[in-house]
């Protein structure tokens, strides 16, 4: 008698954006399971609901204006973290734009640490991740808002599912 392992979420990469046109992008949370990579679309409605929920929780906890504002700033990270407690099937069903790739479809998955200008006079730079996924259908590039997790941790996370395909 054989039993197959249950699919579980093993990690997330928040706020990964990919170009969808000349001036437009789509934001996703990259959800890594023990079997595949799920692309969970961050729709405006989902982000708005999450922000309202986080602010309401802060207000119910006695937070004033600045406490609610601080909670709202942390909402994007909290948005991604909620996927850690969800079933993969529920994540896929959450939004019409959600999808996945499994290791048999991936030729290479590359994680790079990049820098972007913060746009100020003192030229502070911000680190971010560039994740390039080359599949049998083509290549897609995702840039994160920051470096959470860092590049090495992201590579380790992806390698748990994609093994030697991760560079």
Predicted regions and their residues:
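Acidic, Ser/Thr- and proline-rich intrinsically disordered linker/docking segments
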Residues: 3-8, 18-27, 35-167
């Amino acid at each position: 008698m054989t039993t197959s392992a249950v699919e579980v979420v093993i990690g997330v990469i928040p706020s990964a954006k990919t170009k969808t046109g000349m001036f437009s992008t789509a934001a996703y949370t990259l959800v890594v399971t023990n079997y595949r990579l799920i692309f969970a679309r961050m729709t405006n409605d989902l982000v708005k609901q999450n922000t309202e929920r986080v602010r309401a929780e802060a207000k119910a906890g006695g937070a004033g204006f600045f406490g609610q504002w601080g909670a709202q700033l942390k909402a994007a990270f909290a948005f991604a973290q909620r996927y850690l407690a969800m079933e993969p099937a529920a994540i896929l069903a959450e939004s019409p734009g959600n999808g996945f790739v499994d290791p048999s479809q991936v030729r290479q998955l590359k994680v790079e640490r990049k820098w972007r200008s913060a746009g100020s006079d003192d030229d502070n730079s911000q680190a971010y991740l560039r994740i390039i996924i080359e599949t049998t259908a083509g290549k897609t590039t995702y840039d994160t808002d920051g470096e959470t997790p860092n590049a090495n941790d992201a590579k380790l996370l992806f390698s748990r599912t994609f093994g030697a395909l991760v560079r």
